[in-house]
Structures are given as C-alpha cells and as structure tokens.
UniProtKB/Swiss-Prot annotation:
It comes from Spodoptera frugiperda. This protein promotes the GTP-dependent binding of aminoacyl-tRNA to the A-site of ribosomes during protein biosynthesis. GTP binds at residues 1-7, 77-82, 139-142. Belongs to the TRAFAC class translation factor GTPase superfamily. Classic translation factor GTPase family. EF-Tu/EF-1A subfamily. This is Elongation factor 1-alpha.
Length: 413
C-alpha cells in the first residue's frame, strides 16, 4: 500500500545488509542533511536508486540486493500506487515470495484493507500470479495507540489472516512480524520495545520454522523447485549495449538452462544467434538455471533488434514462438463495467506489454472448479471467470500455464 512504508522497510534492509558501499551511503546522508531532512530516511536509498534508474543510468544491480544468512535476496520493487500494478504484475511473476507490508497506525490499516484498498488487491495479484509464499510485515508499530501495542498487532493479524485465507493463502504458513522499518524494530534483530512478542512461527508440509524478525522470516522461505529439465525460456527485461562487449540482453531464466555456446532464438522476432558468455553478480557462469537473473552476450545482433518482452529459448529444443491469438482463462478482479467481445485492453505477460483484443468470450466458468456455467455470455464483470480468445495487436510470446507457468499468466488493465 502506498504509505505502508515499503520503501523505508526495503531501504532499511538494503542499507543494513545490502550492496550499497559506505561512500554512497555517506553521500546520501550528506544530501539528506543539506536538504534539511535532518533525520536520514531509509526510503531515500530507494528514491535515489529509482531516480537513477529512471534517468536511464544502468544501476549496478547489486544495489537492489541484500543478503540473509542463507540467501541473496533480489528486490523486485512494486510501489503501491495504482499505475504501478502493471509493474507488479510483470515483476511479481518473477518473485519466489511476496512481503506484504501493512501499516499499523490508526486508520492507516483500515484504509489499505478497505473494499478498494490496495493491500487487498496486491495480495490477490500475488496469489493469482503464482507467488505462493507470503510474509506479512505489520509496520509502523511505533505509531500505534499506545506505541508498540500488542492488541493492535493481534487485531491486524486476525483481519489479514481472514482475508488472505479467502484469497487462497494458508495463514498458518505465513509469518506475521510486527516491525518498524523506520526505527528498525524486529527488522534484523529482536526489538526490546515489544516484550509481548514471542516470535512468529509457521507450519507447512515441508516443516516448521520460527523466529523473531523480518530477516529470519526471509531466511525461512522455501526455495522453489527449479524446472531445469524443461526447455529454456528467458523473458528479456532489458537489453544493454556495453562498450567493448556488445549486446547484452538481461532477464531471468524461468525454465531450462542457459550456457555459453547455446544457439538461442528470440521470439516472436525469430532472431537466432550464439551466446558468447553468461554473467551473474558480475561473475561469469558456466550455466544459468531457473531463478538466475543474468546478462548474456550475443553475437551479431544489435540492441535495436531486441526488446523487453521478447523471450529467448534454445533453437534446437522446443523453441518459443509468437502467437497470433490464444485462448486463456481470465478472472475479472475489479473492472468498473461490463466486458464484452471487442474490448481491447493492454496485456502484461512476463515482461511483455501489448494491446490485446477480447475476440470471443467463449464461456463463463466457476472460479474454483473451472467448470463451465454459461456458454457464449454477452459480457463478463468483476468477480467473473471466463474462457476467452485473445488476439494481440502484434505477435506475443505466450505458453500454456501447465507447461511454462511464468509465460502462461498475465494481467490486463
């Protein structure tokens, strides 16, 4: 949610355990003082990084990472404002875990969780897009009445549990952590201000976990099974031109393995070329596996020929192709009116962003069972699920959800 304190919380984690060097931090602190922001805000870290990223400066990706005892955590920022939901859709589809930050302040929590609040929408999106692990940070515990109130935390935990359960999450498997991203309570170490908090604990079929702070909850994430045995699919997030090296597409391996020497094809443009090298965390890799965010250098292809939303695959093993049309199950989350044949919204699938026409609404189905409830409905509205034939304005690389989940889920808005 916009003011739940996501940036401050994230900034705090990057600041304390991340890839930001001392010099940069001192520079930020000095600027903050000069601007009369007496106290240095962690959110600033994120604002500075975002500003640089928006100016087209290739940010050293290390800045968007921090380390726990067990993992490298890469932050896929999903700011809370309405127009950012699209980023969230393309970004969330790459997340292994979502951290939902809710503000505990009087009135703040209620606003976020209200009928059209964003907390609700974000949690629903994360689940719909296949992010099955969730952590809830109950933030701004310092601004409850009285500060660090146990009853306020319990009230919020109860309320959030009930609605994430409706969405499909199992609350018993979700860590609820009372925090202050600003003061640092329960972020990296147990807070002395909440002696009543005995810790979070989760139960799931893979076993139990418990801890006191947010970083431990991140440490307790289960690493998802990585589909290395499937054909290669790597949606491009960006394409850089790097002096002395050449064209470097960047993206996350979703399925399969990418290694130097692979002859890749980029769909839907059908451009074929050889991979010269693969790099992650500034180190050359002999192979990249699902979950790896990598840059790879390709021969004889200019930056202009490739774009975000293209998908790289192995030309010799079930390569990806563009689709001129496709059939999908669509769930209408919150759309103001009726949707009928001919409706042409913008669709976001993996990293692609493209106008698509609802050519034919074939049937309405039950959201939970998928059974048909009505053939050829005139229109569909909020809450409905339907099977629809979609026609993208130009070829789009999509796959069946069964075979390649990250390329089989999308959002239209």
């Amino acid at each position: 949610h916009v003011d739940s304190g996501k940036s401050t919380t994230t900034g705090h984690l990057i600041y304390k355990c991340g890839g930001i060097d001392k010099r940069t931090i001192e520079k930020f602190e000095k600027e903050a003082q000069e601007m009369g922001k007496g106290s240095f805000k962690y959110a600033w870290v994120l604002d500075k990084l975002k500003a640089e990223r928006e100016r087209g400066i290739t940010i050293d990706i290390a800045l968007w990472k921090f380390e726990t005892a067990k993992y490298y955590v890469t932050i896929i920022d999903a700011p809370g404002h309405r127009d950012f939901i699209k980023n969230m859709i393309t970004g969330t589809s790459q997340a292994d875990c979502a951290v939902l930050i809710v503000a505990a302040g009087t009135g703040e929590f209620e606003a976020g969780i209200s009928k059209n609040g964003q907390t609700r929408e974000h949690a629903l999106l994360a689940f719909t897009l296949g992010v099955k692990q969730l952590i809830v940070g109950v933030n701004k515990m310092d601004s409850t009445e009285p500060p660090y109130s146990e009853s306020r935390f319990e009230e919020i935990k109860k309320e959030v549990s009930s609605y994430i359960k409706k969405i499909g999450y199992n609350p018993a498997a979700v860590a609820f952590v009372p925090i202050s991203g600003w003061h640092g309570d329960n972020m990296l170490e147990a807070s002395t201000k909440m002696p009543w908090f005995k810790g979070w604990n989760v139960e799931r079929k893979e076993g139990k976990a418990e801890g006191k702070c947010l970083i431990e909850a991140l440490d307790a994430i289960l690493p998802p099974a990585r589909p290395t045995d499937k054909p290669l699919r790597l949606p491009l997030q960006d394409v850089y031109k790097i002096g002395g090296i050449g064209t470097v597409p960047v993206g996350r391996v979703e399925t399969g393995i990418l290694k130097p020497g692979t002859i890749v094809v980029f769909a839907p443009a059908n451009i074929t070329t050889e991979v010269k090298s693969v790099e992650m965390h500034h180190e050359a890799l002999q192979e990249a596996v699902p979950g790896d965010n990598v840059g790879f250098n390709v021969k004889n292809v200019s930056v202009k020929e490739l774009r975000r939303g293209y998908v790289a695959g192995d030309s010799k093993n079930n390569p990806p192709k563009g689709a001129a049309d496709f059939t999908a199950q669509v769930i209408v989350l919150n759309h103001p009116g009726q949707i009928s044949n001919g409706y042409t919204p913008v669709l976001d699938c993996h990293t692609a962003h493209i106008a698509c026409k609802f050519a034919e609404i074939k049937e309405k189905v039950d959201r939970r069972t998928g059974k048909s409830t009505e053939d050829n409905p005139k229109s569909i509205k909020s809450g409905d699920a339907a099977i629809v034939n979609l026609v993208p304005s130009k070829p789009l690389c999509v796959e069946s959800f069964q075979e390649f989940p990250p390329l089989g889920r999308f959002a239209v808005r």
